């Protein structure tokens, strides 16, 4: 069983991920994970903290000589900004908790609900953990899963398709061409004309002291039919992937394939007809289902989209109420981004990679990479013969 936990506060000394269930013998390097961490920090519209943090992972356990051991993998990402917060965020009694205390909850954040739930008088005790800074640890864990998927021939590509109401046009690009174009983009958007308009929307929001959201799309190529299951609700692959994407901070909606547009169509306009060709097997000429039917992958590329709301921390804060005095007040202002949709896209890739890797291990198992690949190859051979 593949699982992970993260720990750490936004301005604490570090973030930690503990990953369990990775087969032994998987080649893995810090450089590989650091590349994904670096992609998470990119993106037009990011805030000042991205200039402070240069995220890099340290392996504390689970590897030797560049190979996984099959034991839990502990990954640490240091917070460079800790030097400025060490006394305020100290774990020892006597921390200067009176400094930079937050008592004015921000609409749209976990501040007020978290304070009520955990009985905190200082909202910093909530926002330090609910912060999207935690996603650096998630990307580190998801990168391990992504590396495993590469060994099985599965490729994950994310792209931003909407920012601030500006929509990218549909493009028919091969995965290699799409990936190359996205790496050159400041917003991970393949439509260059739309990207320029998106950047203008971000600039306008920045000047107005506001923020913008958007939509990102994740595609997974090379996924065979048969991952996931229809026999129980919690084993349905589309449900697991949707939950993983919904767990990302500020994501408010997820769709698969046609998604919500399917509700406005007739059945004959939505389903993907089935064809068969000798040497190719079963295939579809359309992929409106997004690569999954009945909670099971069907052999077509997986296609998911997630909608991210505008970041709720605003330089021109909204109305709030002081937690202590109960007096009307403007919401607190913390350092933040104008747009973090590109970062959310990278986090989405990690989330999808994690769930897919888990589904692959459930299907074919293996305590070592060699055993997993043997089982995987036998299954693919069977699929080709059906």
Swiss-Prot record:
Binding site for FMN: 129-131, 249-250, 294, 309-313, 335
Bound cofactor: record note: Reduced FMN (FMNH(2)).
E.C. no: 4.2.3.5
Catalysed conversion reaction: 5-O-(1-carboxyvinyl)-3-phosphoshikimate = chorismate + phosphate
One record GO biological process: chorismate biosynthetic process
HAMAP family, A to Z: Chorismate_synth (MF_00300)
Oligomeric and partner information: Homotetramer.
Protein name per its UniProtKB record: Chorismate synthase
Organism: Pelotomaculum thermopropionicum (strain DSM 13744 / JCM 10971 / SI)
Organismal lineage: Bacteria, Bacillati, Bacillota, Clostridia, Eubacteriales
